[in-house]
Regions:
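Domain-level signal for soluble alpha/beta catalytic cores
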Residues: 1-221
Length: 221
């Protein structure tokens, strides 16, 4: 039975539980700069500690323990450690050349662990990136944008494709702050499904609401 069929069947019976936070849980491990570098070929001198997506390559044991802790607690769906694993966010660290490996290995790791528990699912996480299309990065020039839609779409396509190739059941556009960014994420997810022929992969979107009027950071409701 295809993942979509299993998910649909379970959703018709009960609420499925998604795992919890990744970043704050990783902080509890007390990792140092070396844990984020290890044998990676990185020319940048930027501090990498806190770039948690790198851990799927440098400390997969930590990410595996995190996945298992949520599955042991009863999660039906675990999320990959790929929240910032697209070229836009990784370029801030000089590690954009690693995004294909991060997404593929992150998906494979979560897939392997989920399969050990049986009837559990993997959501490939795609975060909002560090650039928003609805908001200028220059208060003096509100018409300016730090990135174009096409640039964002291409970065998301690259990420989504590797997540699907790595075996995720779901593509999760997570904590959306800007609906235009989310639109690019959904378009990229559809592209990845069509390109790989894995039409059973589901698409989910979660948004971060910042005030009582149900507005996201970019001001839309």
């Amino acid at each position: 039975m295809k993942p979509k069929s299993r998910l649909s069947e379970l959703l018709s019976q009960r609420v499925l539980l998604l795992d919890g936070a990744t970043g704050t849980e990783i902080q509890k491990f007390g990792l140092e700069e070396e844990d984020f570098r290890r044998t990676l070929e990185i020319e940048s001198n930027s501090e990498l500690r806190g770039n948690n997506d790198l851990l799927v390559l440098t400390r997969p044991d930590v990410i595996e323990r995190l996945h298992r802790s949520y599955l042991d607690a009863g999660a039906d769906i675990i999320t990959t450690c790929t929240f910032n694993a697209q070229a836009i966010s990784q370029s801030d660290y000089g590690t954009e050349h690693l995004v294909d490996r991060i997404n593929y290995e992150g998906a494979r790791l979560a897939r392997r662990v989920a399969d050990e528990y049986g009837n559990r699912f993997v959501a490939g996480t795609m975060g909002p990136t560090t650039r928003l299309l609805s908001i200028s990065d220059d208060a003096e020039h509100p018409e300016r944008r730090a990135i174009t839609y096409d640039e964002l779409l291409e970065a998301y396509k690259r990420q989504a494709l590797k997540l699907v190739e790595g075996g995720v059941d779901i593509l999760l556009i997570e904590t959306a702050l800007d609906p235009i960014n989310a639109k690019a994420g959904v378009s990229a997810a559809r592209y990845a499904k069509e390109t790989t022929g894995r039409e059973e992969v589901l698409i989910m979107v979660s948004a971060t609401v910042t005030d009582a009027n149900a507005r996201v950071l970019s001001g839309q409701s």
